[in-house]
Amino acid sequence: MEELDLRQIRRQINDVNDEMLKLFVRRMELSAKVASYKKAHNMPTLDRKREEDILQRVANCTEDEYRQYALEFFRYMMDISKQYQETIK
């Protein structure tokens, strides 16, 4: 791989990172709305069934090569979301 090619690939990765950051912020904003709803209705932060459904969908939609990493990514993202939801008053 030539250095120029590496720079181009890294620029593309930076672009993807920028898109992912925007989506992350949007997801956290929605998580805050979920937290407010759950608090107003005396519901727990954790919804195991919802998490299982999300992970099953991720597993079904991800190629074998990336599946374990996608699942790990989504588990971590859901953990962060739960932590954040706990801070919502």
Please annotate each region the language model reported.
Residues 1-89:
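Domain-level signature for soluble enzymes in the chorismate/prephenate branch of the shikimate pathway
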